[in-house]
Amino acid sequence: MLLLLVPAFQVIFTLGGTRAQSVTQLDSQVPVFEEAPVELRCNYSSSVSVYLFWYVQYPNQGLQLLLKYLSGSTLVESINGFEAEFNKSQTSFHLRKPSVHISDTAEYFCAVS
């Protein structure tokens, strides 16, 4: 069984000191069997247009950009099989992978800008 860690914290960004945006990751740890699907949930709040990001930090490595939503298609895919879908009405940007592998063991961070 794999253990994908999703730090349970809230990231808050302030734009020009007048507008606040926040991200909430609801799952702190997500145990998954190898080759099983996984979904890491990310909800945000914002009163303005958003850019959304997923970062990954593998053991003993620095933070790396996994994927980002800037505009256009609501489905964003990464080169390693992960995807995230921007859902404006549900204010979510959940990260998914249909089949995880031991190499996916890491901490995953959602961010908004």
Swiss-Prot record:
Signal peptide (residue range): 1-20
Domain (Ig-like): residue spans on this chain: 21-113
PROSITE patterns from the entry?
A: IG_LIKE
Disulfide connectivity for this sequence is: C42-C110
Arranged from A to Z, the UniProt key words for this protein are: Adaptive immunity, Cell membrane, Disulfide bond, Glycoprotein, Immunity, Immunoglobulin domain, Membrane, Receptor, Signal, T cell receptor
One GO biological process this protein is involved in is:
adaptive immune response
Gene Ontology CC terms: T cell receptor complex
Chief localization class?
Answer: membrane
Can you tell me which residues are glycosylated? N43, N87
The record, for SUPFAM superfamilies, names: Immunoglobulin
Q: Does the keyword Disulfide bond apply?
A: yes
The protein's matches in Gene3D superfamilies, at most eight in alphabetical order, are given as: Immunoglobulins
Q: Which domain of life is it from?
A: Eukaryota
* Alphabetized SMART domains for the sequence: IGv
Q: What does this protein do?
A: V region of the variable domain of T cell receptor (TR) alpha chain that participates in the antigen recognition. Alpha-beta T cell receptors are antigen specific receptors which are essential to the immune response and are present on the cell surface of T lymphocytes. Recognize peptide-major histocompatibility (MH) (pMH) complexes that are displayed by antigen presenting cells (APC), a prerequisite for efficient T cell adaptive immunity against pathogens.
PANTHER family reported for this sequence: T CELL RECEPTOR ALPHA VARIABLE 8-6, T-CELL RECEPTOR ALPHA CHAIN V REGION
Name of the protein in question: T cell receptor alpha variable 8-6
Give the originating organism: Homo sapiens (Human)
What broad taxonomic lineage does this protein's source fall under?
Eukaryota, Metazoa, Chordata, Craniata, Vertebrata
The gene name reads TRAV8-6
